[in-house]
């Protein structure tokens, strides 16, 4: 693989919730480093993206505390945009134990949004984090299929996709998987709903 390709990275900070009626409004952050999302292209690439998909260009494609705090504010704005939140509903924000997820800025954002931050313990995301247990594997599979299909249609002789060609693959996978499926049962099975009455046996066995 050419060196220039090895320097190009993207990540997707995904959000799902247990409310099917608002899932499509949840923010999705697609992050690319400066070598992947070129400064001269970023404005054009952002045009035409779904309203809840934010394309972010920064030095690194990895998330950080600043982005996490921004994400919290975007989630709060999406919820408040739905005629206000019901007073009897408490939002739980489930994040893994990476240090970037509980920086002072993130904690302040959660407090301002009245979110309860729930940190999934290390090495347990595979078991009780709904994105990991139910969403990401399917999302990656759908994205790979879309990528291969786009490559087959690409005008480039080597099959490489431009960002203009690749980003719709991500948009489609988000809409098909993250927004196109109900996730309440996943939260229930992982222990975050239904009073834990629907807790999956695999969780009981492993914990």
Regions found by a protein language model. Give the residues of each.
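RecA-like helicase/translocase P-loop NTPase motor core
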Residues: 1-207
